[in-house]
Amino acid sequence: ELFVLRDEGIIKACAIVNSNSNKEYKKVAWKVKERDNNVWIIHALAVRYECRGMGLATQLIKNIISYAKLENIEAIHLDVIDKNTLADKLYIRAGFKYVSTENIFYEVVGNRQFRMYEYVIE
């Protein structure tokens, strides 16, 4: 799914969210384990450059969490690449909990360290 924040037809922020996790996610000590599409993964979240600092990423995350509750999703998982401290702060502020740091290979960046975060929906 593509979640989008628009203003007057202009996309200000967007996120790709679905239940398709990377194989490395299986070895993470999540509180909520993946089964039968009960967990969503935020794969990418982006805010238009000139719109940064306006709280749009926070609003988009809140929208994703709200929709996940309506869809009976039990948790949201994601990873943050090493040195992206702004993303770490964003997700922690939104209520995500740090789980672990893992080596993950993505074609775009190669083998890197990623911090794993989880939001358990209650």
What is the predicted role of each segment?
Residues 1-15:
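Conserved beta-hairpin
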Residues 15-44, 52, 107-108:
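Conserved acyl-donor/pantetheine-binding loop and adjacent beta-alpha core of acyl/acetyltransferases
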Residues 36, 81-85, 93-94, 104-122:
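C-terminal "cap" of GNAT-fold acetyltransferases
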Residues 45-47, 80:
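Hydrophobic adenine-recognition pocket in adenosine-nucleotide-binding enzymes
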Residues 47, 53-66, 89-93:
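Conserved acetyl-CoA-binding loop-helix of GNAT-fold acetyltransferases
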Residues 61, 68-79:
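Conserved GNAT acetyl-CoA-binding A-motif
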